[in-house]
Amino acid sequence: MNLCLDARRGTRRPNTVFGYIPNTAEAAYYGMLQGFNEYLNQQKAEDIERLGANVTHEKLHEILSRRIRAEKVAWKDIKMRTFIAEGNSRNDLAAHVYDITYGSVRPGVDNLVVIDDSIVRGTTLRESIIRIMDRLHPRRIVVVSSSPQVRYPDYYGIDMAHMEEFIAFRAAIELHKERGIEARLDVIYQRCKAQLNLPKEQVVNYVRDVYEPFTSEDISEKMAEMLRPEGVTTEIHIVYQSIEGLHKACPHSPGDWYFSGHYPTPGGNKRVNEAFVNFYENSYKTK
């Protein structure tokens, strides 16, 4: 996976600890470690070659003893999935599901890089995970998502039909406000609304225009800001897999509509436009 160059550089630094959250990210975590170990072995070979005639037992031992600092820094103490919970009950669950492994991170010294399988709403991160990681007092926290930014409803799987449920969408809306381009949202709304009575085969997904002015990094930075819990001062970064990286990692699974907005059926375009119209009318027309 092409996830994070800075995280990969951490394989050469003794002050970076890698972990995963939640339990469903375990497979992605081991895949990440495999990639890091391959990269580290390549670096070891190059460092040994550079020694040339100056090789000594001590230098060779130092190079060969380099390891990825992999720790199970967080774990679920009860078998619960907060993803499918509703409203306040979800927040209550998220706040109590996880515990940490003390001593796995050197306070104020180590960077903590944790991989998540996906960050959709951001509830678990904000209400639980970041607070728990902050109790370890790392120098910085980097949350790496093995999936790209989930920007659109699925409609073929889990029922999340409201655009405002997605942290990526909320971040894009906030960026419109910050940059003084909120009027774009009304244009998108008018385009979506004009298509409501068209046959689904003629509908274009104009919701994709919500993200057009911003890079993925812009949205990730805004998400990190929005998901920072009150009272947490540790530096926080969120890094997402790219869509290109996803296709490279999973070449035989081309479906990416919840990331790209390219729905496999016309009905998807129609439904996502309806979802944006509902969001806009509830958020702006009622003011």
Regions found by a protein language model. Give the residues of each.
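PRPP-associated nucleotide enzymes
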Residues: 1-287
